[in-house]
A protein has these predicted regions:
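Beta-strand residues in well-ordered beta-sheet regions across diverse protein folds
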Residues: 24-26, 70, 93, 116, ...
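Short Fe-S-cluster ligation motifs
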Residues: 231-238, 242-275
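Local cysteine-cluster metal-coordination motifs and their immediate loop/turn environment
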Residues: 124, 193-194, 215-240
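FNR/FR-type flavoprotein reductase catalytic core
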Residues: 76-219
Length: 275
């Protein structure tokens, strides 16, 4: 874990959609002391642009000497990041947070998992999907042009709200039929919180182990400032991945989050703020 920013070079920029780009960083270079980034699916890094700010991003690509983050264009920080080119440098610290539990099943070797992703939430799930040996994956987006990793993750069921690709609807519309066919033992999800609330309800109804990766405003990433607290849980340390039993106890899940100034607002207001 890197507790202080280490400068790393952008090796590749991947255009995932018109508003989403992935930035691949080399972890071993003449200006970086790090030879590898020890990481488990679901963890995140803090990315620092000098003289601007630092923001958290899920690791969406990972290899022996590289890693990547997937970034949606939202505000001033992400605008600047989208303008960065191959050969430019950014400060990286981490990875931080609790990862997905790949050994959640009683018999992991025969475990069948269902992965439910929505929008840019797929970034938290991409490496997880690549490491799961036996899974069915559902991805949802508003329209076909917003679906991510279609060439990279070839075996996915797709949903779009406008019907432009795959099933017309949202990923949770498919859960009943998928469970009848696949009888999965665990569900992993990341995306819009309303979608994850429905996944939690489904998992409770069918007594299926589930984990969700939550998004909150993360500032220090080490559990000191309390900015990312959700009903007392510091999501940068105790999360961002939480299991169903924990989510059931969180009154704020699906309802409230905190802005950068600490104000508690509705999820809709929180997601509407640009970063």
């Amino acid at each position: 874990m890197l507790l202080e920013p280490v400068m790393m070079k952008i090796e590749e920029v991947i255009l995932e959609s018109s508003l989403v780009r992935s930035f691949i960083f080399k972890t071993c270079s003449e200006r970086s002391e790090s030879k590898s980034l020890e990481y488990q699916p679901g963890q995140f890094i803090m990315l620092w642009i000098p003289r601007l700010d630092e923001k958290p991003f899920s690791i969406s690509y990972h290899g022996k000497d590289f890693f990547g983050v997937t970034v949606a264009l939202k505000g001033r920080f992400t605008q600047r990041l989208h303008e960065m080119k191959v050969g430019e440098w950014a400060g990286i610290r981490g990875p931080f947070g609790r990862a997905f539990n790949l050994g959640a099943c009683p018999e992991p070797q025969g475990c069948r998992a269902c992965v439910v992703g929505g929008g840019v939430g797929m970034a938290s799930l991409a490496v997880l999907i690549e490491r799961l040996e036996n899974s069915v994956v559902v991805q949802g987006a508003r329209t076909a042009s917003e679906l991510l990793y279609r060439n990279r993750l070839k075996y996915m069921l797709l949903c779009t709200e406008d019907g432009s690709a795959g099933t017309n609807g949202v990923p949770t519309d498919l859960l009943e039929d998928l469970y009848r066919h696949y009888r999965f033992d665990a569900i992993y999800t990341c995306g819009p919180e309303a979608m994850m609330v429905r996944v939690l309800e489904f998992a409770r109804e069918y007594n299926i182990y589930m984990q969700a990766s939550l998004e909150r405003y993360i500032k220090c990433a080490v559990g000191v400032c309390g900015q990312c607290c959700c009903n007392g849980l510091r999501l940068c340390v105790e999360g961002p991945v939480l299991d169903g039993g924990t989510l059931e106890k969180l009154e704020d899940f699906g309802r409230y989050a905190r802005l950068g100034n600490g104000c508690r607002v509705t999820i809709g207001t929180y997601l509407g703020k640009k970063t």
